[in-house]
Amino acid sequence: LVRYPGNPLLEPIEEHPWESKYVLNPGALRFGDKVYLFYRAVGHDGISHIGLAITDGYKVLERLPEPIFSPSTPEERMGCEDPRLVVVEDKIVMLYTAYDGNLAQIAAASITLEDFLSGNYRAWKREGLAFKNIWDKDAILFPERIGGKYIVYHRIEPSIWVTYSREIKFPIKEKHAIILGPRPGRMWDSLKIGSGA
């Protein structure tokens, strides 16, 4: 690997209160020659929002001055974090972490491809929590069925869990199970692991 000399691609913008402290941990989607970065943004109030930057993969072509997704439910009181997105049929499905200041939970939202590609970036529909009242983060959804089912990887600390579901519907009713845990000992991955991006 070679570090890209144009880093950092995104930095906080002091004049934007919602992203004045940190920008981090983006999910990405590629459409044509553009890469859309859905990034976690934190202001000095400590609340996380999701911003959007449109890139060619190396430089930012456009960065929206307002968040495209902001907290609006009690479970999101302290933020919407760490978006992970996939295209499923005619819509984009986003799994993210809803955080109320005490409990982090996986939540889902969707937007039609038509709305998104026409620039109607705030037309998201909240789909609900994946597993209510369970501390859970780092969720990723496979965009296609495997063996007739959708697969969600997620992290109930300290391990990576998997859930299989016949449909993308929240809350997820199917059972989930650990597929990979931390290694024992004093290793770089011995405390906790997650599915990441």
Predicted regions and their residues:
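Beta-rich carbohydrate-recognition and catalytic domains
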Residues: 1-21, 25-78, 87-140, 144-194
